[in-house]
């Protein structure tokens, strides 16, 4: 079989970043400095006049919710509808994650056969909540917008339980999913960013720099950060029905079509991009015809 690898090419990616820090350091202020922010406020923390003015000046908007499913509806709308916003800010995700943990435990308790079950046995509620967070992140990776998630901070411990610093207070693998992770700090009157994780050449691991949108834009590329979002067309009902029909006809193994979903960052066929699902349909039709 011929080798299928391609020579690597640089791709202009939207910024996907995680900001965390203690209360009052200015995580929200830092995040809404980015172009045309669509702020999803999960703590009603952006109601003061200062935040309102920043949002107005930057052409932003605010949506307040404490419900994870409402958040998902907004993300899907931003993914698939034409709009003027360029940066999605979820501030903070910690609140929604903790709510997911509580709801997952309650669901497991309700459906348990054990009378004294709490729903938290063996950390199963974490597994349930983490599935939903992974689904969210899959959609965020497809979103043609800058994405900034903020998180509360918590102490980070060494094996001997000595405090060695701070880390984000959320899904513990959240940092794997982002190109940049900043710990936002306040030093006197100045706000600084400590680079806790980077996949980008122009941001050095463990460096500290005065935080501003201008500084980020100079390093990342203003054109990338400020270009208009392009909506993504999802699979039609007809495409979904046709693909399911072909899968059943040919008896495609689940592990095969699950790879198709994973590759497109989709949890179900209805979430697949229109062009991606059409490639699957065309492939199966060729297979039927023996090509």
Predicted regions, residues:
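P-loop NTPase motor core
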Residues: 92-173
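Structural motif
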Residues: 18, 87-89, 148-149
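Short, glycine/polar-rich helix-capping loops at beta-to-alpha or helix-loop-helix junctions
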Residues: 27, 45-53, 170
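Phosphate-binding/switch region of NTP-binding enzymes
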Residues: 22, 138-216
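Conserved catalytic network of the ASCE P-loop NTPase/AAA+ motor domain
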Residues: 10-12, 78-83, 139-143, 173-175
């Amino acid at each position: 079989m011929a080798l299928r690898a391609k020579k690597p090419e640089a791709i202009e990616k939207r910024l996907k970043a995680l900001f965390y820090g203690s209360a009052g350091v200015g995580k929200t202020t830092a995040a809404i400095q980015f172009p045309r922010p669509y702020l999803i406020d999960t703590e009603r923390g952006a109601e003061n006049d200062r935040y309102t003015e920043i949002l107005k000046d930057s052409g932003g908007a605010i949506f307040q919710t404490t419900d994870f499913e409402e958040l998902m509806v907004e993300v899907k709308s931003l993914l698939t509808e034409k709009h003027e916003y360029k940066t999605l800010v979820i501030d903070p995700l910690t609140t929604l994650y903790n709510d997911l943990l509580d709801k997952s435990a309650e669901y497991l308790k309700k459906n348990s056969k054990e009378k004294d079950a709490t729903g938290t046995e063996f950390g199963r509620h974490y597994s349930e909540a983490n599935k939903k967070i992974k689904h969210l992140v899959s959609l965020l990776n497809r979103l043609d917008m800058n994405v900034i998630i903020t998180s509360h901070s918590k102490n980070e411990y060494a094996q001997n339980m000595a405090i060695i610093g701070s880390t984000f207070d959320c899904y513990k693998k959240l940092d794997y999913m982002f190109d940049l992770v900043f710990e936002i700090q306040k030093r006197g009157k100045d706000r600084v960013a400590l680079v806790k994780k980077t996949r980008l050449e122009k941001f050095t691991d463990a460096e500290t720099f005065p935080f501003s949108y201008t500084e980020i834009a100079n390093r990342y590329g203003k054109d990338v950060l400020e270009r208009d979002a392009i909506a993504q067309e999802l699979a039609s009902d007809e495409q979904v029905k046709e693909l399911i029909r072909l899968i059943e006809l040919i008896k495609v193994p689940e592990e095969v079509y699950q790879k198709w979903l994973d590759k497109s960052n989709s949890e179900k066929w209805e979430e697949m991009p229109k062009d991606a699902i059409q490639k699957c349909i065309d492939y199966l039709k060729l297979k039927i015809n023996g090509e």
